[in-house]
Amino acid sequence: QTGLSVAYDMPTLMGYDPDHPLSEGEVGKCGVSVFSIREMEKLFNGIPLDKITVSQTINGPAIILLAFYIATAENQGVDPSKLKGTLQNDILKEFTAQKEWIFPPKPSMRIITDMLTYCSKSMPYYNTISISGYHIREAGSTAAQELAFTLADGFSYIEHGINSGLKVDDFAPRLS
């Protein structure tokens, strides 16, 4: 099976359009610029999304990029339930380490929980969150702190999923 890993540029990671003043000099610099469904369709033009897995390194605007990805698949005639892949979507580590967040913690966790709910019901082969400790360590933590924060983040995602009414066995296997 073939897989692709998509790294987005800084404006996309921060939720900015490429013509925003803060995007100047950053568009396409360290990844691809995707700011619309049209751009997502260009990115995957000629690539059958039902035949590959796609890993997307995106956090703050993950729900928007997921919507673009689903729309692109549907425009290819692919049912979202057939999609395989992973979103990084680890917003909690953004607050403690990487600092690429858009919304405050509470609304961010609401979005994450909504994505867990949608994907667990509609995209059974899709990993909704890839919990990452790497950035925490790179931000200066010890190995023990990296492990502690990473596990705490994972437990928090599970707790939010359960509190929203999901059964742990319906969504936790799709966390990586």
Give, region by region, the residue ranges found by the protein language model.
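Catalytic alpha/beta active-site cores
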Residues: 1-176
